């Protein structure tokens, strides 16, 4: 992959930075693993906005991704790498030796023709999926399960990875990119390596319309709203709110802890690093 800085032929092109992806498949996705995707535009079943800044965007089809990687003991060939509009990482189409095809999250250096394998007997190689009790301590991993058989939940986005730093009894300790250290059952699976498209963070969209293509609507500051719309709104001219920053519903919005899952607090060995 290479970074492209465009010539400033227009204001939108001036600031745009793209990443070349010559290794990706240029045709349509595998039809049997594609489903219709309807947009909710951030509305719930009553039609009220529950998630702001969503709506519009280019039509997308959902690719069915195998997050469980539970087809054990059978070699699979990487047929091709593909772009997926539903996630930042690339996806790989695997063809197992019995003829079945599945999409998986692609590893960083994965390419067409590679052989991958799932299960306890899989070799220690990037792209292979194993229970974490069979993975050497210190390995870089991604697509980490939190419950055996539930499917990957951690380290799934572009360039993401985690590190297995310890194994003791029925648990392993996983260090995440945020700095958090977490206990995970050793029977949970993970994939060796790191997620593809690690240069995703280097791209710049260049114009507001490029974000609209993705279904992302504008974010309006509360201080420029009317007082009926936001606690920071109102006033003649530019005025500070006179209070600590809050959300539209009056809750503190900077550094306010929202975690409410006490059941798994005991599994977090070290909290994530503070930002800023």
Curated annotation (Swiss-Prot):
Residues 224-265 are annotated as: Disordered. One of its GO terms (biological process) is cytoplasmic translation. GO terms for molecular function: rRNA binding; structural constituent of ribosome; transferase activity. InterPro entries: NA-bd_OB-fold, Rib_uL2_dom2, Ribosomal_uL2, Ribosomal_uL2_bac/org-type, Ribosomal_uL2_C, Ribosomal_uL2_CS, Ribosomal_uL2_dom3, Ribosomal_uL2_RNA-bd_dom. Signal peptide: none annotated. It holds the Pfam family Ribosomal_L2_C. It comes from the Bacteria. Keywords: Ribonucleoprotein, Ribosomal protein, RNA-binding, rRNA-binding. Coiled coil: none annotated. One of its GO terms (cellular component) is large ribosomal subunit. HAMAP family: Ribosomal_uL2_B. Belongs to the universal ribosomal protein uL2 family. One of the primary rRNA binding proteins. Required for association of the 30S and 50S subunits to form the 70S ribosome, for tRNA binding and peptide bond formation. It has been suggested to have peptidyltransferase activity; this is somewhat controversial. Makes several contacts with the 16S rRNA in the 70S ribosome. Part of the 50S ribosomal subunit. Forms a bridge to the 30S subunit in the 70S ribosome. This is Large ribosomal subunit protein uL2. It comes from Dichelobacter nodosus (strain VCS1703A). The gene is rplB.
């Amino acid at each position: 992959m290479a970074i492209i800085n465009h010539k400033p032929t227009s204001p939108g092109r001036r600031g745009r930075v793209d990443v070349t992806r010559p290794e990706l498949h240029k045709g349509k996705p595998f039809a049997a693993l594609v489903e219709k995707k309807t947009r909710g535009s951030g509305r719930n079943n009553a039609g009220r906005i529950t998630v702001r800044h969503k709506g519009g965007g280019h039509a997308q089809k959902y690719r069915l991704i195998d997050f469980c990687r539970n087809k054990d003991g059978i070699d699979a060939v990487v047929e091709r790498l593909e772009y997926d509009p539903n996630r930042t990482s690339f996806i790989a189409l695997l063809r197992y030796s019995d003829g079945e095809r599945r999409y998986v999250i692609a590893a960083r250096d994965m390419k067409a023709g590679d052989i991958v394998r799932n299960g306890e007997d899989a070799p220690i190689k990037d792209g292979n999926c194993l229970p974490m009790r069979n993975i050497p301590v210190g390995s870089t991993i991604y697509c980490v399960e939190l419950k055996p058989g539930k499917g990957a939940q951690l380290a799934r986005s572009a360039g993401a990875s985690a590190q297995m730093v310890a194994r003791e009894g029925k648990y392993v300790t996983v260090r995440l990119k945020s700095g958090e250290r977490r206990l995970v059952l050793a029977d949970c699976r993970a994939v060796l390596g790191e997620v593809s498209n690690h240069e995703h963070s280097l791209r710049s969209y260049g114009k507001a319309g490029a974000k609209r293509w993705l279904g992302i609507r504008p974010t309006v500051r509360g201080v420029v709203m009317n007082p009926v719309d936001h606690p920071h709104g109102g006033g003649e001219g530019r005025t500070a709110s006179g209070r600590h920053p809050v959300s539209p519903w009056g809750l503190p919005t900077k550094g306010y802890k929202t975690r409410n899952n006490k059941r798994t607090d005991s599994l977090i060995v070290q909290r994530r690093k503070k930002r800023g």
